[in-house]
Amino acid sequence: MDKVIEMFSDYLAHVRRHSENTLKAYKKDVRKFLTYVGKQINNIERKDVEEFLKALSKGDITGESPRETTISRYISSLNSFFNYLELSGMIYENPMERIKHPRIRRKIPDFLTEDEVSSLIGAFNEENELRQKTAISLLYYAGLRISELCNLRTTDISFIPPFLRVEMGKGRKDRLVPLPDKVIPILKKYIDLENPKIFVFENGKKHVHPSTVFRWLKEGVKRANIKKDVHPHTLRHSYATHLIRKGVNIKVVQELLGHTNLSTTSIYLHVADQEKFDAVKKL
């Protein structure tokens, strides 16, 4: 089993050009499936996949009932795996045929107000918490994913003109994110004082771990007395929502966020629509 999974992983990395996070997730999903089924690969049938997905949805695989997005990811993982096996001649019938993704209910993302963002960033002391303040500032002012922040390298920063180069992976073109004036002084001060060598936020020779940034964020939220469940992605949602509110074209927001599909970005239009409904309720 391990050999086939590693061959599959190499295929995803070098042919499909998937990101490291996707590789880890797909390998983990496939390993759980094969362990559950307990069959030789060429003996696996569609009913085995259906039984696994049923057990997964009941919480028998992970210990809790997963969201539709998690089930959909498992299906994507297994689709990729069996497509690879078929291309490689290891199987002749694909058990994933006619296996459909669950219908996912799209949830309007939570976001912070501009005042809450200011309070959050202002909760960090620039003299002895410059690292934390800079990291949280970039999550918002550059709309970064937590993985993008942690993997950010010193060579990805330009001050003239001011922008970040964000690696997109999956064979996609890197995106350039312009930096607003508010974040430039603090980023420049951090780079000048800390002088990071490879990664902007280093931990020895490696980059800082996402859990560390999450801990910084939670501390800032507590100090700012923000009564919302705030995660690193909340700042990215806030960045997109505020841009849409200010009248920025949705296609521009799509490029800034690095979304492949415009439909992914369009969820932020619903945030503005919801505001309208909330407004008329006050009449």
From Swiss-Prot:
GO terms for molecular function: DNA binding. It is found in: Cytoplasm. Residues 1-86 form the Core-binding (CB) domain. One of its GO terms (cellular component) is cytoplasm. The active site is at R145, K170, H233, R236, H259, Y268. This is Tyrosine recombinase THA_404. It comes from Thermosipho africanus (strain TCF52B). One of its GO terms (biological process) is DNA integration. The keyword Cell division applies. CDD domains: INT_IntI_C. Residues 107-281 form the Tyr recombinase domain. Keywords: Cell cycle, Cell division, Chromosome partition, Cytoplasm, DNA integration, DNA recombination, DNA-binding. Site-specific tyrosine recombinase, which acts by catalyzing the cutting and rejoining of the recombining DNA molecules. Gene3D superfamilies: 1.10.150.130, Intergrase catalytic core (1.10.443.10).
